[in-house]
Regions:
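C-terminal ends and interior cores of transmembrane alpha-helices
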Residues: 87-107, 304-319
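A late C-terminal transmembrane helix in Major Facilitator Superfamily
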Residues: 354-382
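Juxtamembrane intracellular "pre-TM" segments in multi-pass secondary transporters
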Residues: 2-13, 200-234
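C-terminal transmembrane helical hairpin of 12-TM major facilitator-type secondary transporters
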Residues: 296-343
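Helix-to-loop junctions at the C-terminal end of transmembrane segments
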Residues: 64-81, 282-295, 382-383
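Short amphipathic helix-loop junctions that connect adjacent transmembrane helices
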Residues: 35-50, 251-268
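Intracellular juxtamembrane helix-capping segments at the cytosolic ends
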Residues: 125-139, 338-352
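Loop-to-transmembrane helix entry/capping segments in MFS-fold secondary transporters
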Residues: 48-52, 141-150, 265-266, 351-363
Length: 411
């Protein structure tokens, strides 16, 4: 009985936070491997349009989280746990989707590669919204900032580990071996949700046990109670603009650094993980920092920091010192992790009903649409000007986030 209790996902225990973080770590490993893959493909001849196409299409499942939420809220098998059921299914499917990449040659952006990575991302999206809903359901309000720090920190650390390992393996051995290592690492992280136990009720609502299904009326009522207010509207505006600049950066930075600044793909692939690891540490500490500093100050500081990284990149040319161009690659992920942890704790606090997957999925759907917009407009922004113009545009796209972030962190 004591062993089962120790694996119960409640009260912010070590196992509770560790299990949530393990799922996030798995998602980070996947994302880091994709970052390394785009760098590798650019280094062997892929264009900005190729990378834009790859990232845009593989991002589509993330934008559909708005529609995945109601499904995850409405259907489950409580014997496996309301959210854990979906986490287990999606984690297994994530690994199966990339299994073919262990065997087929990957030397360009093509239809098969796009299809496999899109399927993989679809299951990652299901896992993501399920674990977010699990966190919103199982954590008390005063635990969310700290837990989000560990969760997002783990995801960012996972990205760094995934990108560093994949870069080394892609350039030294090949893409097939890189995806084999990814599957092995995701299988290891899968142990935590596999052996966990989930509460049968939302934290703080012990008298209302979960049901296997929610009716349409219950779903609509739950969404309405959480989403029809000014704070939720401001949060949606924030998320709609949050990732446009990051999406532009991800599409163009490889070509910019390789063709304009004279870097190699391996140099990029080895350096960027340091920013992700720094972001992981910032993410882990961001929740704790809110104890000593106002959340508003920290959120606006990180948003401003990301804008400054983009503006700095707009000034780079071949004569720019290497330490300065290196700081931009490191900084973009470091500051992104900081504001992400803070805004996600705010979003989870807005999910006050049993429709957490739908509520959080709406917020994250807007965030992923934002990334999709950035990925898609990057070639056109670059075509309308130059790299400097594209980076300035990325910085300016953060202005609505600064304004809505100020509103969301009011006392």
């Amino acid at each position: 009985m004591e062993l089962i209790k120790s694996r119960l996902l409640s009260e912010g225990s070590v196992w509770h936070i560790g299990s949530l973080s393990a799922v996030y770590l798995s998602q980070g490993l996947s994302g880091g491997t994709l970052f390394a893959l785009t760098t590798y493909l650019v280094s062997i001849g892929a264009s900005v349009k190729d990378i834009s196409l790859l990232l845009s299409i593989t991002m589509i499942p993330w934008t559909l989280k708005i529609f995945l939420g109601p499904i995850i809220d409405s259907f489950t098998l409580n014997r496996f746990g309301r959210r854990r059921f979906w986490i287990l299914i999606s984690q297994v499917a994530m690994m199966l989707a990339v299994m073919p990449l262990v065997f087929i040659e990957v030397s360009e952006v093509n239809f098969l590669l796009i299809c496999l990575l899109t399927a993989h991302n679809a299951f990652v999206a299901v896992s993501d919204i399920s674990v977010d809903a699990l966190a919103a359901d199982s954590l008390n309000a005063d635990q969310m900032a700290n837990a989000n720090g560990f969760m997002w920190g783990s995801k960012t650390l996972g990205r760094g580990i995934g990108m560093a390992l994949a870069t080394s393996i892609f350039f030294s051995y090949g893409v097939n071996e890189g995806f084999l290592i990814l599957i092995i690492l995701m299988s290891t992280a899968f142990i935590f949700p596999l052996f966990s136990e989930e509460l049968s009720y939302k934290a703080g609502q012990q008298n209302e046990s979960y049901k296997n299904r929610l009716t349409l009326g219950e779903l609509i009522a739950g969404v309405s109670a959480s989403m029809f207010n000014r704070s939720a509207f401001a949060a949606m505006i924030f998320m709609l603009f949050a990732n446009i600049g990051y999406g532009i950066f991800d599409v163009i930075y490889n070509e910019f650094y390789i063709e304009e600044l004279g870097w190699s793909g391996e140099e990029i692939g080895y350096l960027r993980p340091f920013g992700m690891w720094l972001g992981g540490l910032i993410g882990l500490s961001a929740g704790l920092l809110t104890i000593y500093f106002q959340k508003r100050l920290l959120l606006l500081l990180f948003i401003t920091g990301q804008g400054l990284v983009f503006l700095a990149a707009s000034t780079f040319d071949p004569s720019t010192p290497t330490w300065m161009t290196s700081m931009a690659i490191i900084g973009v992920d470091a500051v992104d992790a900081g504001w992400s942890v803070l805004i996600f704790s705010i979003l989870m606090a807005l999910c006050t009903t049993n429709t957490s997957a739908t509520n959080f999925g709406i917020f994250m759907g807007f965030g992923n649409i934002s990334m999709l917009i950035g990925n898609n407009i990057a070639p056109y922004i670059l075509g309308a000007g130059d790299y400097s113009f594209a980076f300035v545009f990325a910085a300016l796209s953060l202005i609505p986030c600064w304004l809505t972030g100020y509103y969301l962190t009011r006392s």
